[in-house]
Amino acid sequence: MGRARILVIDDERAVRELIADALKIEGHDVHTADNGKEGLDLIGQYRFDLVFCDLRMPEMDGQALYEEVQRDHPQVLKRIVFVTAQANSADYGPFLRSTGIPVIEKPFTLSQLRQAVSKMVGQTR
């Protein structure tokens, strides 16, 4: 599969660092952001092969990020994977089902991250 450029967006530092460290060990170029606004800025600056994004975050949540990306960077939509504990919540469940964006539910395993990278990066290259 090779080295991928991956963005990790999560307001929880421990989660963000866990994902980033696991992906770096696999040899990937990893960038991080602690909210959707910072993530959107990075999406505007770099071409990412994959974006792991939390849903519930301050300043700009994952749903607002998705809507901005859909409008301004539609080519990135097929590269997003939501990593969230909110997959079945009343707030985000209907949104997730309507987008068809892949979801990894928290708590997750490193194997789930590896599988997502393998599947998503293979589709976008």
Where are these regions (language model features)?
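Active-site residues of response regulator receiver
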Residues: D54
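Conserved phosphotransfer cores of two-component systems
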Residues: G44-Y46, M60, V69-K78, L96-S98
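Short hydrophobic/Thr-rich beta-strand motif most characteristic of the beta2 strand and flanking loop
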Residues: G27-D34, L42
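Acidic catalytic/metal-coordinating carboxylates
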Residues: D34-E38, D61-L65
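Charged docking surfaces used in two-component/phosphorelay signaling
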Residues: E17-I25
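Receiver (REC) domain active-site loop signature in two-component systems and cognate sites
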Residues: M57
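C-terminal output helix
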Residues: T99, F108-V117
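Hydrophobic/aromatic residues positioned on beta-strands within the core alpha/beta folds
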Residues: V81-T84
